[in-house]
Amino acid sequence: MDEDLVLALQLQEEWNLQVSEREPAQEPLSLVDASWELVDPTPDLQGLFVLFNDRFFWGQLEAVEVKWSVRMTLCAGICSYEGRGGMCSIRLSEPLLKLRPRKDLVETLLHEMIHAYLFVTNNDKDREGHGPEFCKHMHRINRLTGANITVYHTFHDEVDEYRRHWWRCNGPCQNSKPYYGYVKRATNRAPSAHDYWWAEHQKTCGGTYIKIKEPENYSKKGKGKTKLRKQPVSEAENKDKPNRGEKQLLIPFTGKGYVLGETSNFSSGKCITSHAINESQEPLSQDHSANALRPHSKTEVKFEQNGPSKKTSVASPVLSTSHQNVLSNYFSKVSVASSKAFRSVSGSPVKSLTVGDSTTKSVSAGSQRRVTSSRTSLRNSLKAMESTYVTVPQDAGGPEGKLPSKRPRIEDKTFFDLFFIKKEQAQSGGGDVTSSSHPPAAAQSPSGASGQSRVVHCPVCQDEVSETQINEHLDWCLERDSTQVKS
């Protein structure tokens, strides 16, 4: 039994020694351990940020953005603040950190995360950026992780590697320390007045900076890019523009415009207007009474070509010279202020008796008969057109002749004339309209009214009428004209 006990104790001691040797190996590795260079040489930036935020900053940096910067070459990282709302972004220099070991990436990221934490928690009391608050968190994280976070970086060689554009001053400052007149930059931006030290340099030195170094084939690459970019733009701009030597052909206006609804097949055709919608119906005469058209009346537009005639939709016609003559005779547009066409009689405008203007009319009985006959012929033609529009839908047999029965337009004067004529017939009971309640002008003598001896001339029949009876007399004259049209 003693031998067995001794053997058991020996085995227990050996086991304890093995366990004691394994315990240090089970401790977590440091964030900057050298073994990470082989295990994870290029870590995920966003993954590291989420891990460090949970372990060292209590999840306070969830609203902070972290990303790589491909143009930043002067510093390893930067933290940009955006107001007091807790929004900020961390940018790390990809050109500098991709040449450095993983340890530098971790330390730079933790450095910028401390700046973001101080800003988010409104504890940014460090006016210089790396004050006591920053150093407190920096030492805390260094003790927990074994890292060596500092307030500066030592990537000077990498920074100089990207400064490939050099300038040197040709003035006295080229012999003074510490720069000896050199200006080295990563971008092709020559020293100018935009630099904060430019004014002082002009006072003390006054020299000119001359470029002495740039990357290989930099000028050739720049010229090639500019040529490739400018050629398509210049071609696109000058594509639709004529050359300066060429003259633009100016085509004068021929006087013929475009008809609404016209297609390319009708471009060579000749446009004519016709009042007949049915082809078998005879056209109206071409005298003044037939050509008197209202602007709102609808006529059919035909296009004559070498082949068979084609019809288009109904459109408003363009009044010809004969139409305009009839309208000008019936609807006089001469102003009453014209001394040639009118004269003042007892304060009322009366048409002048002089002959010479085509729009003035004589007050003689013969001229009145001519005016009355022209009005009668005009109204007869309008009445014939109205009957034509009413009877066409019944006679039209083809699909082109079928027109839907529509209510007459309110603007049509013919419709109003026929409406008032029918209304007067219904009121008079079929009797003669001339036997209306309006007496003739002779019966309404101005002598009947005492104290009112002022007499004016009627603008329609040129009779002398009392000023108090002129409105009733005008109504009677208009009714007489409508009666003549009816007869």
Swiss-Prot record:
<feature type="binding site">
    <location>
        <position position="461"/>
    </location>
    <ligand>
        <name>Zn(2+) 2</name>
    </ligand>
</feature>
<feature type="short sequence motif" description="Nuclear localization signal">
    <location>
        <begin position="401"/>
        <end position="412"/>
    </location>
</feature>
<feature type="modified residue" description="Phosphoserine">
    <location>
        <position position="373"/>
    </location>
</feature>
<dbReference type="InterPro" id="IPR044245">
    <property type="entry name" value="Spartan"/>
</dbReference>
<keyword id="KW-0539">Nucleus</keyword>
<feature type="binding site">
    <location>
        <position position="130"/>
    </location>
    <ligand>
        <name>Zn(2+) 1</name>
    </ligand>
</feature>
<dbReference type="GO" id="GO:0008270">
    <property type="term" value="F:zinc ion binding"/>
</dbReference>
<feature type="short sequence motif" description="SHP-box">
    <location>
        <begin position="253"/>
        <end position="261"/>
    </location>
</feature>
<dbReference type="GO" id="GO:0031398">
    <property type="term" value="P:positive regulation of protein ubiquitination"/>
</dbReference>
<dbReference type="GO" id="GO:0005634">
    <property type="term" value="C:nucleus"/>
</dbReference>
<dbReference type="GO" id="GO:0016540">
    <property type="term" value="P:protein autoprocessing"/>
</dbReference>
<keyword id="KW-0378">Hydrolase</keyword>
<dbReference type="GO" id="GO:0003697">
    <property type="term" value="F:single-stranded DNA binding"/>
</dbReference>
<comment type="function">
    <text>DNA-dependent metalloendopeptidase that mediates the proteolytic cleavage of covalent DNA-protein cross-links (DPCs) during DNA synthesis, thereby playing a key role in maintaining genomic integrity. DPCs are highly toxic DNA lesions that interfere with essential chromatin transactions, such as replication and transcription, and which are induced by reactive agents, such as UV light or formaldehyde. Associates with the DNA replication machinery and specifically removes DPCs during DNA synthesis.</text>
</comment>
<feature type="modified residue" description="Phosphoserine">
    <location>
        <position position="267"/>
    </location>
</feature>
<keyword id="KW-0068">Autocatalytic cleavage</keyword>
<feature type="cross-link" description="Glycyl lysine isopeptide (Lys-Gly) (interchain with G-Cter in ubiquitin)">
    <location>
        <position position="413"/>
    </location>
</feature>
<feature type="cross-link" description="Glycyl lysine isopeptide (Lys-Gly) (interchain with G-Cter in SUMO2)">
    <location>
        <position position="486"/>
    </location>
</feature>
<feature type="compositionally biased region" description="Low complexity">
    <location>
        <begin position="435"/>
        <end position="453"/>
    </location>
</feature>
<keyword id="KW-0863">Zinc-finger</keyword>
<feature type="region of interest" description="Disordered">
    <location>
        <begin position="219"/>
        <end position="248"/>
    </location>
</feature>
<keyword id="KW-0227">DNA damage</keyword>
<feature type="cross-link" description="Glycyl lysine isopeptide (Lys-Gly) (interchain with G-Cter in SUMO2)">
    <location>
        <position position="422"/>
    </location>
</feature>
<dbReference type="InterPro" id="IPR022636">
    <property type="entry name" value="S-AdoMet_synthetase_sfam"/>
</dbReference>
<feature type="binding site">
    <location>
        <position position="458"/>
    </location>
    <ligand>
        <name>Zn(2+) 2</name>
    </ligand>
</feature>
<feature type="modified residue" description="N6-acetyllysine">
    <location>
        <position position="230"/>
    </location>
</feature>
<dbReference type="GO" id="GO:0016607">
    <property type="term" value="C:nuclear speck"/>
</dbReference>
<dbReference type="InterPro" id="IPR055220">
    <property type="entry name" value="SPRTN_ZBD"/>
</dbReference>
<feature type="cross-link" description="Glycyl lysine isopeptide (Lys-Gly) (interchain with G-Cter in ubiquitin); alternate">
    <location>
        <position position="340"/>
    </location>
</feature>
<keyword id="KW-0645">Protease</keyword>
<feature type="region of interest" description="Disordered">
    <location>
        <begin position="427"/>
        <end position="455"/>
    </location>
</feature>
<feature type="compositionally biased region" description="Polar residues">
    <location>
        <begin position="280"/>
        <end position="289"/>
    </location>
</feature>
<comment type="similarity">
    <text>Belongs to the Spartan family.</text>
</comment>
<dbReference type="GO" id="GO:0006556">
    <property type="term" value="P:S-adenosylmethionine biosynthetic process"/>
</dbReference>
<dbReference type="GO" id="GO:0036297">
    <property type="term" value="P:interstrand cross-link repair"/>
</dbReference>
<dbReference type="GO" id="GO:0019985">
    <property type="term" value="P:translesion synthesis"/>
</dbReference>
<feature type="active site">
    <location>
        <position position="112"/>
    </location>
</feature>
<dbReference type="InterPro" id="IPR006642">
    <property type="entry name" value="Rad18_UBZ4"/>
</dbReference>
<dbReference type="GO" id="GO:0106300">
    <property type="term" value="P:protein-DNA covalent cross-linking repair"/>
</dbReference>
<dbReference type="GO" id="GO:0004222">
    <property type="term" value="F:metalloendopeptidase activity"/>
</dbReference>
<keyword id="KW-0234">DNA repair</keyword>
<dbReference type="GO" id="GO:0043130">
    <property type="term" value="F:ubiquitin binding"/>
</dbReference>
